């Protein structure tokens, strides 16, 4: 059953990453490795997201890439890997001993994912494969993942369509007197699942664990979390800094902050909406709330207008911040120093839209733009949408920022 416009092997039960897509990624990987590390001989991919990127499956095993070949070695589940991946060479492994017997003579240097490979994993690897030296290849993989292919963009457009439908169109019907933060978040999450969302939000950062996202009412949106993001929540408990409280019920006169992630077949979009429950005109802080929210809309639209090929990332940040109203300095991004971030297989892809990032934008990059302002004693306001960089400027995948809507 075809669901996306792109030609993908797709059924209701199983959607595989096309073989030509995987091969194109592997070819680009080899080209960048040749450029950055001339004479390289072997690279080992262990992280499940990178394995999915290159092999189209997430298993307990490793993908070994050499200039002349690539082999997916799987401990568990070999059968599932063979069903999901369209790589030509997939083999079972019991341990790294299997690889030690195959890769002889052993190259002197191996390239690994240093950002995610644990010391324990590396020690186990070196027990059977005693490479003389190692180096990181994280920058190579990040460079490849930054530019999205037509296949990847088809998935992100589908995710963005779900995101826009649920948060812009359906959310108001669930914002009712007495609903809890947790219940509202879960209801919206369920609506996304019903429409095809893959149901999790993956992050690079270790503290980024999320499934449902979060809903915050009023001042609970000001509670900072350990995760490096502007949105706040008290969480379900001390141990879980997301979703929202099952005991904080919605009352009139509260801001409703919704940051519920969405994704399709591994590819995410990011979107945040804010509603006001009640009659904003009767709120003593109505002018302050409206002004701060409208400034966030202005900042998002300004940032999006600068997302053009050739623009230097840090210059975008500086140009936008030149138009930033200093009265919001203490509450902007809840202390963060960025305007947004790249997004794709994880929510927090590099680079961020921030100072210090000197790379230039290219068509095919995708960024979430999320200006947000914390209003002490009131709550969090802001907007967020996901934008594709094209030759003709930025195109939103999740809709445009909407005026602050009141739910009466």
Segments the model singles out, each with a brief description of its role:
Residues 1-408:
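Active-site neighborhoods and metal-handling regions in enzymes and metal-associated proteins
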